[in-house]
Design a protein with these regions (language model features):
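Sec-dependent signal peptide recognition
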Residues: 2-10
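C-terminal motif of bacterial Sec signal peptides marking the signal peptidase cleavage site
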Residues: 13-16
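Bacterial signal peptide processing site
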Residues: 18-21
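N-terminal export signals and maturation junctions of secreted/periplasmic proteins
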Residues: 37-65, 69, 79-137
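Sec-exported extracytoplasmic/periplasmic mature domains
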Residues: 68-79, 87-94, 148-151, 162-169, ...
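Acidic/His-rich structured neighborhood in mature extracellular/periplasmic domains
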Residues: 111-257
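Flexible, glycine-rich surface segments
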Residues: 208-322
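C-terminal functional modules
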Residues: 314, 319-369
Length: 369
């Protein structure tokens, strides 16, 4: 579920879960030309030849040994097979360095400096918007079906996939098992989290008959068009094309899975995302987790520049426009977008990129918020 706000965009997709919740029944998938989709071969889960001892980069790693015991005792994996698998798994020191860089904190700036404008330019560009139009046109029927099934607008699904992977152009080239094993076994600060993700990764590989040594994604283990972490896969991924397998490198399954994610997070069908405000409120705390009554925001000097519907409360969002700040009323659907990545900039970019692609499809110039 890029992205890294608190850890990494898709990493903020959720905590680990050992079972998938029941999803609503899916309408029949329309017949399509299979040659238009990326091809993937499903093979029996093997991982590696059985081995009597753990060799390779994690040969003397007690965390790896404990993990093997955990998977054998809790999930019935064969110890010798896991030893053979991890003997072929590589420790990636550069992944640890990148994670440390993401965890570093830097002093904040004082006053507006254009932070939102710089962030927006990473995603909302003419070329990127046109690539989004091409993706939407190619998968229009799937996007419409996902919107009908889950109640999530097509532009939100398109915006997520665009921000996460440029509509499949940048899905990551790191072997997922290498990334997750490195962080689970040799990154103490987040070892428990990544051990849970590695557990879910091996479970989904076995369930979907995937070779865990073949799957590639981000340096933190995020997968496919929507950059789901394995725990997100377990909770939200769906077989949207009806072929009997869940494949997040397949854009159709990814579209349905992103839509299901938002539905499960509480997306309100037909509701507003956010509304710009006139005025300034420098004395108020800002962020998607704040909560104010509309009356309190009015008393602080803000006025909505559009309808707030029936909402009596809102978060107060602030975008750095360079010379000043632009304030927004953040509504529940905006908060839902931040569940994918805990960042005001991220959520606004997803929403505005999706809008820009939608407008470009219909021949309108993108709005400049």
């Amino acid at each position: 579920m890029r992205r890294i706000a608190s850890l990494l965009p898709a990493l903020c997709l959720l905590s680990a879960c050992s079972s998938k919740p029941v999803s609503p029944p899916l309408p029949p998938a329309p017949q399509s030309n299979a040659s238009s989709l990326p091809q993937k071969t499903y093979v029996p889960w093997q991982g590696a030849q059985a081995s009597g001892a753990l060799t390779g980069d994690f040969a003397n790693n007690p965390n790896a040994q404990r993990f093997i015991e955990r998977m054998a005792n809790e999930h019935g994996f064969d110890r010798r097979q896991l030893q053979g698998l991890f003997a072929q798994t590589e420790r990636l020191d550069w992944v640890i360095r990148l994670m440390d860089q993401q965890a570093a904190t830097y002093p904040g700036s004082y006053g507006p400096n254009g932070a939102w404008l710089r962030y927006r330019k990473k995603f909302i560009t003419p070329d990127n918007v046109q690539n989004g139009v091409a993706f939407w046109n190619q998968y229009d029927a799937d996007l419409q079906r996902a919107s009908r099934t889950y109640g999530v607008p097509e532009e939100i699904i398109v915006g997520i996939i665009g921000v996460e992977t440029r509509w499949g152009r940048v899905m990551g080239k790191t072997r997922i098992i290498d990334a997750l094993a490195t962080l689970a076994f040799d990154y103490p600060r987040r070892a428990d989290y990544f051990a849970d993700e590695l557990e879910q990764f091996l479970l989904l590989s076995r369930k979907e008959n995937d070779n865990p040594l073949a799957l590639r994604g981000s340096y933190a283990g995020a997968m496919g068009y929507g950059q789901f972490m394995p725990s997100s896969f377990a909770k939200y991924a769906v077989d949207f094309d009806g072929d009997g397998h869940i494949d997040l490198w397949n854009p159709r399954d990814a579209i349905g899975s992103v839509a299901n994610y938002f539905k499960q997070q509480g997306w309100r069908t037909g509701d507003i995302v956010a509304v710009p405000a006139s005025g300034q409120a420098p004395s108020l705390d800002v962020g998607f987790e704040t909560q104010y009554s509309i009356a309190a925001l009015s008393s602080a000097g803000l006025r909505p520049q559009g309808s707030l519907g029936n909402h009596a409360n809102a978060s107060l969002l602030r975008l750095d426009m360079g010379r000043n700040y632009q304030y927004w009323y953040g509504l529940p659907n905006f908060y839902v977008i931040t569940r994918y990545n805990h960042s005001t900039h991220y959520a606004m970019a997803v929403w505005k990129l999706g809008e820009a692609v939608d407008q470009a499809r219909h021949g309108y110039a993108a709005k400049g918020n």
